[in-house]
Amino acid sequence: MTLNLNPLETNLVNLVIVIGLLFWFLRGFLGGILERRRAAILQELQDAESRLKTATENLSQAQSELAAAQQKAEKIRADGQARAAGIRAEGEKRTISVMAAIKAGADADAEADAARIKDSLRREAALAAIDKALAVLPARLDASAQAKLIDSTIKNLENA
């Protein structure tokens, strides 16, 4: 074997030896680092899967709670509409009864006014008839007829 003094070939051999030695000595060190990194990645994946599972369960629970809340809201809305309809109907009944009372009061007032007007007209008619009778009576009655009328009126009053 001859000694190779070619620097390029010699460096390649030296590099192969150095790389081999580095690989041999650092294999445990780099392997440990890589193994720890692999374990950390696996742990992170497991944590992510568990968080995904928890999030999925929470989402499912939230969706069921949302559905229950929507049903409750719908029931509350329906109850509110029913209550509003009842209140509206009650208000209409009260309005009708108040209107009937007002109409009855107005009818009573109208009847009272009509009765008052009738009485007033009767009184005026009676006064007019009396005035006319008093105006015509002295010319038609002489003293003897007047005495007879007075006597018959007194007898009627005594019998009554």
From Swiss-Prot:
Coiled coil: none annotated. It is found in: Cellular thylakoid membrane. It comes from Synechococcus sp. (strain CC9605). This is ATP synthase subunit b. F(1)F(0) ATP synthase produces ATP from ADP in the presence of a proton or sodium gradient. F-type ATPases consist of two structural domains, F(1) containing the extramembraneous catalytic core and F(0) containing the membrane proton channel, linked together by a central stalk and a peripheral stalk. During catalysis, ATP synthesis in the catalytic domain of F(1) is coupled via a rotary mechanism of the central stalk subunits to proton translocation. It is a single-pass membrane protein. One of its GO terms (molecular function) is proton-transporting ATP synthase activity, rotational mechanism. GO terms for cellular component: plasma membrane-derived thylakoid membrane; proton-transporting ATP synthase complex. The chain crosses the membrane at residues 15-35. Belongs to the ATPase B chain family. Keywords: ATP synthesis, CF(0), Hydrogen ion transport, Ion transport, Membrane, Thylakoid, Transmembrane, Transmembrane helix, Transport. It holds the Pfam family ATP-synt_B. F-type ATPases have 2 components, F(1) - the catalytic core - and F(0) - the membrane proton channel. F(1) has five subunits: alpha(3), beta(3), gamma(1), delta(1), epsilon(1). F(0) has four main subunits: a(1), b(1), b'(1) and c(10-14). The alpha and beta chains form an alternating ring which encloses part of the gamma chain. F(1) is attached to F(0) by a central stalk formed by the gamma and epsilon chains, while a peripheral stalk is formed by the delta, b and b' chains.
